[in-house]
UniProtKB/Swiss-Prot annotation:
Gene3D superfamilies: Vaccinia Virus protein VP39. This is Methyltransferase verB. Pathway: Secondary metabolite biosynthesis; terpenoid biosynthesis; Mycotoxin biosynthesis. The keyword Methyltransferase applies. Belongs to the methyltransferase superfamily. One of its GO terms (biological process) is terpenoid biosynthetic process. Its EC number is 2.1.1.-. The lineage of its organism: Eukaryota, Fungi, Dikarya, Ascomycota, Pezizomycotina. The gene is verB.
Length: 228
């Protein structure tokens, strides 16, 4: 197992949410999860969703909570179907437990840099997410972008693939960000010193007809529709 996946054992996962979403994303990457990342996720996630590189399940857990009873009115429960994909089975197991929807949740241990066997089932989803995943994958921007093609068979024709990643090039990091970048890359958790937004956008445009992106702070947010 790669170090970036091995790091997330059952104990470390509990600290992940606080460190990443309350400290690193705010002070290091200037792309706060609460005001940017979570609204971005919520606006694109569909009833049938595949979450790739799920980590602790922060994003699907948040959407699940928001779909429950609020202000005395019942909202349709999310999800209809949820597939949690990660290289580390600890991540998918913990995320599935936290989401709390066992009847409609499945888990899959897979490497997105390789063709995903489950694609042979021809099940497709309304949405696929890669939130804070690409900067953890080993290799160049071009090799990481193979993940888009591997995930494309899972997406409905009218579905959306979306995600976010911390950039190494094309942005100016502050001192704290540079420190976290150095430490994370030295430990093999990140592999993003060479990651430029244009590389990912070009790769997405090869697999999808409609691609949108924006850089917030040091983070690339992207959406891709109409798989070709």
């Amino acid at each position: 197992m790669h170090p970036s996946a091995r790091l997330y054992n059952n104990i470390a996962l509990w600290f992940y949410d606080y460190l990443v979403h309350s400290i690193f994303m705010v002070y290091g990457w200037h792309c706060p999860t609460k005001s940017v990342g979570l609204p971005f996720f919520s606006s694109h996630v569909g009833p049938k969703h595949m979450d790739v590189g799920v980590g602790t399940g922060y994003f699907p857990v948040a959407v699940r909570k928001s779909s429950r009873k609020r202000n005395g009115q019942l909202k349709p429960q999310w999800p209809q179907k949820l597939m949690l994909v990660d290289l580390n089975p600890n991540c998918t197991a913990m995320a599935a437990t936290r989401v709390g929807a066992p009847d409609c949740t499945e888990t899959l241990t897979a490497d997105v840099l390789q063709p995903i066997p489950a694609a042979g089932k021809h099940e497709t989803f309304d949405s696929l997410s890669l939130m804070n995943v690409l900067h953890c994958l080993p290799g160049t921007s071009e090799s990481k972008a193979q993940a888009f093609g591997h995930l494309k068979p899972f997406l409905k024709e009218d579905g959306v693939l979306f995600g976010s990643t911390i950039l190494g090039r094309g942005v100016e990091h502050n001192r704290f960000g540079r420190l976290v970048m150095w430490l994370s890359n030295s430990l093999g958790i990140f592999h993003n010193y060479g990651d430029h937004p244009d590389d990912f956008v070009r790769a997405l445009q090869k697999d999808f007809n409609q691609v949108e992106h924006v850089v917030v702070g040091r983070v690339l947010l992207f959406t891709a529709k109409e798989p070709n």
